[in-house]
Amino acid sequence: MKKIGKALRETAFTLGVCFIAVGAFASSSVYAQTIIEDWDKVTRPAPPELKSVTVDIRSTALLVLDFNGAQDPKKGPCNTEIKPRCLTSVPKVQTMLSEARAKGVFIVYSLAGIGTPADIATAIAPHANDPIVKSGPDKFVGTDLEKILADKGIKTVIVTGTSSEGAVLDTATDAALKGMNVVVPVDGMSSTDLYAEQYVAWHLTHAPGVSAKVTLTKIQMIKF
């Protein structure tokens, strides 16, 4: 009987410890917060530093991504109905594009959706020999962009376009992870809203494996 009593007491003690542990876990789970619950507690980070950059024209390509839709909103995202900030960025991109062409920089375009080359904003329209790829947000996926750049000995890409959280972020990230140097002018990328542009600027300068290869800048701070 003594052995049975001792065994019962030990069992009861073990069960008690288990109940306490389960209770503590359940209690902590109730109070555990995810980013969704803590959304309003987030402190906005300081803006990333913009840096001047000089690129080697022989090994640099300018990517002009998804600027189609300017003439017909049904033909792409760069229009007054969906992304008016994209149209606002066109004059600055045009300035950089003109200088890049004059210096012999390799230019590559992309298209989104059902757009055709004729749907790209007229001010920055491609020339006859400019390569044009067409795919989803990451312009390396489902295209020969990597080969196009490799065949030209490209080591640095300047990424412009819309949307910032789509074509710019995904293509810039992929390029960085492939070992390329990536230059992103903040006044050459655009989105539907400011938050997306802010997030992309933060992500590109903080993401592990990416930030070390990315230079965030402005168009006027890029020297060819």
Residue ranges, per PLM feature:
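A short alpha/beta connector and helix-capping loop motif
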Residues: 76-100, 104-106
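Short, glycine-rich nucleotide/cofactor-binding loops
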Residues: 68, 80-89, 160-165
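Short beta-strand segments at enzyme active-site cores
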Residues: 64-65, 105-112
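Active-site-adjacent betaalpha module
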Residues: 31-61, 103, 114-224
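Short, contiguous, helix-prone interaction/anchoring segments in small proteins
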Residues: 58-81
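C-terminal segment of classical bacterial N-terminal signal peptides
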Residues: 19-29
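Bacterial N-terminal signal peptides that target proteins for export
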Residues: 2-17
